[in-house]
Structures are given as C-alpha cells and as structure tokens.
Amino acid sequence: MNNILELVRQTRRKNKLKREILDNDRKIRDNRKRVELLENLLDYIRPDMSQEAILEIVENMKGDYEDRVDDHIIVSAELSKERREVSKNVKDLKKAEIAHK
C-alpha cells in the first residue's frame, strides 16, 4: 500500500513539475518577445521624430500584433476541431473493435 501511495505522490509531483516548467518556458518566451518588440521599436524611432510620428508607429505595430493574435486564435480553433474529430474517430474505432471481439 505504501508503494502505491508513494507512486501516486511521485506521479503527482512529476506532473506538477511539468506544468511549472511549461509555465516558466512560456514566461521566458513572452519576455523574449517583449525585448524583441522594444528592439524593433528602437529601430524605427529617430531623434528628429515628432510624438505623433512615434505614436503612429506604435499604433501600426499594435495593429500588426492584434492581427497575428487573431490568426493564432483561428488556427487554434481549427486544431481543436480536428482534435475533437480525431478523438471521436478513435472512440468509434475502439467501440467497433470491442463489438468485433
């Protein structure tokens, strides 16, 4: 019984560590993207630019990033739909296999 409890405890810990690693990787990726965004912004801004010109650059960049987010949302929805279809097909195949035996 103790071995089973230890196995469960270790498995839960492993899963928690996996989630924490993924979360940390996401944070690293997000911060790298922020650094890249700021570097891109610095490439566009010149000392002689007006505040309006700088705001226009920022608004254009914001629009581009919003479009990318929308594209990723669409791709995610398509992948989720395909995953549901595959899950349904696997379930149907398992039922057919059980009925065949």
Curated annotation (Swiss-Prot):
InterPro entries: DUF496
Family, as annotated: Belongs to the pole-localizer TmaR family.
Main localization of the protein described in the UniProt heading: cytoplasm
Location(s), subcellular: Cytoplasm
Keyword annotations of the record: Coiled coil, Cytoplasm
Function: Pole-localizer protein involved in the regulation of several cellular processes.
Any GO CC annotation of this UniProt entry: cytosol
Pfam family of the protein (one): DUF496
Keyword set includes Coiled coil: yes
Entry protein name: Pole-localizer protein TmaR
Recorded superkingdom: Bacteria
Gene: tmaR
Coiled coil: 14-43, 76-96
